[in-house]
């Protein structure tokens, strides 16, 4: 120390008071710079700790959004099950309508068979009536022939034989009486035939009326059955069309829901990926914070060593160089802190944009599937 003081006095001969004042000023400036560095680093650490708490809140919000999306997926599955139940009910109604149609066809077949039986009976009655008319005509023609023969025989008797004629007349009288009896019998037969013909005609008219009535009723029933069949066919066609439309709408809805679900799952994966990336970024930021703390400790140690060297060397020029070096280090630390703060603000803005997009997507899904 005495040799160094001697060399300083030989190079620059300032007094001892000036050196003491310079040393005090340098010490005060170093203390102020150290306090400023410590305050800036404390503020950076506080901001980073606050940022990590916000990230924890954002993760909780992401978990709630994922739960809401799972609830929406459950709602969509329940809607799909309800549409499937409606399709099964329509299929059951279609099968019941088909069974009713087959039953109506069987009834129509039975009624057609009854109509054919009635027609065959009517044809049989008509044939019997024609036979009775033919028998009546034949009996009438035979009676006319007998009268003609009787007249011829009477004339022959009158011309040829008187006794024999009397005998013949007696015979004729007998024959006439017999003929009269036959005529009376014929009249009785005619009356009976007429009565039977009237009964047959009345029966025929009754049968015709009954047949017409049955034909009208059958026509009405056929028309009713035809209209019912048309209505059943119309209902079946409408039910089939409605079922086709429902199936098509269900398929379109399922496709749209699958597309939306795929989009939601993709966005969910993207959000999970972003959350993982943000976790990695937080880990990196924490590592950077630890590095900054280490740098701060090294800077404090460097400052301490610089002060010790300054006290040991007590050279103004060398101390100014050390101060500049420390100032450069402080500027570098401040710049790194500013960069870190800008990155954290950008990351926070990006996270808020993603959350707003997720809220809009959830609002759209709630609007589409209330």
From Swiss-Prot:
Keywords: Coiled coil, Cytoplasm, Nucleus, Phosphoprotein
Compartment(s) where it occurs, according to its Swiss-Prot or TrEMBL record: Cytoplasm; Nucleus
One annotated Gene Ontology cellular component of this protein: nucleus
Residue runs in coiled coils: 36-346
InterPro entries xrefs: CCDC89-like (IPR043450)
Domain of life where this protein originates: Eukaryota
Region of interest called Disordered, as start-end residue ranges on this chain: 1-26
PTM annotation (Phosphothreonine): residues: 12
Subunit structure: Interacts with HEY1.
Family named by the database record: Belongs to the CCDC89 family.
Protein's name in the database: Coiled-coil domain-containing protein 89
Source organism of this protein record: Rattus norvegicus (Rat)
């Amino acid at each position: 120390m005495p040799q160094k003081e001697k060399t300083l006095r030989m190079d620059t001969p300032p007094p001892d008071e000036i050196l003491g004042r310079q040393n005090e000023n340098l010490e005060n400036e170093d203390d102020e710079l150290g306090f400023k560095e410590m305050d800036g680093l404390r503020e950076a650490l506080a901001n980073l700790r606050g940022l990590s708490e916000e990230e924890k809140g954002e993760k909780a919000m992401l978990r709630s959004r994922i739960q809401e999306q799972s609830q929406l997926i459950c709602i969509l599955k329940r809607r799909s099950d309800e549409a499937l139940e409606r399709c099964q009910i329509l299929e059951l109604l279609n099968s019941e309508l088909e069974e009713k149609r087959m039953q109506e066809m069987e009834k129509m077949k039975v009624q057609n068979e009854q109509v054919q039986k009635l027609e065959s009976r009517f044809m049989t009655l008509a044939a019997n009536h024609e036979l009775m008319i033919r028998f009546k005509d034949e009996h009438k023609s035979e009676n006319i022939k007998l009268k003609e023969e009787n007249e011829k025989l009477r004339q022959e008797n009158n011309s040829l034989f008187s006794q024999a004629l009397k005998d013949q007349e007696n015979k004729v009288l007998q024959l006439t009486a017999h003929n009269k009896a036959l005529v009376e019998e014929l009249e009785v037969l005619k009356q009976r035939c007429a009565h039977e013909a009237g009964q047959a005609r009345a029966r025929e008219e009754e049968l015709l009326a009954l047949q017409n009535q049955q034909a009208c009723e059958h026509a009405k029933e056929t028309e009713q059955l035809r209209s019912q069949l048309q209505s059943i066919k119309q209902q079946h066609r409408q039910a089939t069309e409605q079922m086709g439309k429902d199936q098509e709408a269900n398929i379109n809805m399922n496709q749209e829901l699958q597309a939306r679900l795929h989009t939601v799952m993709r966005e969910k994966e993207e959000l999970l990926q972003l959350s993982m990336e943000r976790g990695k970024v937080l880990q990196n930021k924490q590592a950077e914070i630890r590095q900054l703390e280490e740098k701060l400790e090294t800077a404090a140690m460097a400052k301490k060593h610089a002060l010790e060297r300054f006290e040991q060397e007590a050279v103004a020029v060398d101390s100014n160089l050390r101060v500049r070096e420390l100032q450069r280090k402080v500027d570098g630390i401040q710049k790194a802190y500013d960069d870190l703060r800008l990155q954290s603000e950008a990351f926070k803005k990006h996270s808020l944009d993603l959350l707003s997009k997720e809220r809009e997507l959830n609002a759209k899904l709630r609007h589409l599937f209330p």
